[in-house]
Design a protein with these regions (language model features):
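RNA-interacting cores
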Residues: 1-241
């Protein structure tokens, strides 16, 4: 399930250059209390990994950069997706009832629309509307750990994306069938950008990708997100035009 959120502020919007944590905070503030507490404190388990099973996009409108802030006109739009309909149903209802504030921006009106992706094919072309983050933790010779962010040309990139998706499947449905196939490859040029989520620096990829495999995994990829840090606003993919 995917919902589109359109927020309107009479004076326009001013948000930080790295605004992902602001959007995440807005969503958590509008989740119904029980759902928000569950997602924040527990989530969905796969071994030692925990998944929130929602993802959100970048803001879709163009902005003017002024110092360390972005200035938007009176309306901003972003998308939120989840394979668990209950997560988004309560969210949309609460935002319509009480749009509230986005940071210091008073929201005068909110519009919510929804769609359920119909995906039965075994391959689909997608475009990232928030950056795809793929990383692994390595250890240096002195024993210190560091984060290695992978680009689509790295040979381990497809494997890490697939393994992450299989763990997400397991956290939702239990056992993972042995015949679940999945592959990902870039379609044309892509762009790697760095940005912060709070004090954490992340690198992610924008571009188009071809996903192939079991429709159950392809559907999950489009609703829960690809790669890591989905609940922080990374890895949302939609059908490519």
């Amino acid at each position: 399930m995917i919902i589109q959120l359109r927020l309107i502020a009479k004076k326009g919007f001013i948000v930080p250059l790295h605004y992902k944590s602001l959007l995440q905070g807005y969503l958590y503030h509008h989740f119904p209390q029980d759902m928000g507490s569950f997602l924040h404190d527990e989530g969905f388990q796969s071994g030692s990994r925990t998944f929130k099973h929602f993802v959100f996009s970048d803001l879709q409108e163009k902005a003017r950069k002024v110092g360390s802030f972005l200035h938007f006109d009176k309306e901003i739009t972003f998308f939120v997706s989840s394979p668990v309909p209950e997560i988004l149903e309560g969210l949309g209802e609460e935002i319509l009832r009480n749009p509230g504030n986005l940071g210091h921006n008073l929201i005068s009106e909110a519009l919510v629309s929804q769609a359920t992706p119909d995906l039965l094919a075994r391959e689909v072309a997608v475009v990232m509307i928030s950056p795809l983050v793929v990383y692994r933790t390595l250890v240096q010779e002195d024993g210190r750990k560091y984060t290695d962010f992978l680009t689509p040309h790295h040979p381990d990139f497809p494997t890490l994306v697939k393994n992450n998706l299989l763990r997400k499947y397991e956290s939702l449905f239990g056992d993972v069938p042995t015949n679940l196939s999945f592959s990902i490859e870039p379609l044309g040029p892509f762009e790697v950008r760095g940005q912060y989520f709070r004090n954490f620096y992340l690198k992610g990829t924008y571009g188009r990708f071809l996903l192939k495999g079991d429709p159950r995994l392809l559907s999950l990829a489009l609703t829960t997100g690809l790669g890591s840090k989905n609940a922080q606003g990374f890895g949302m993919a939609v059908h490519a035009p």
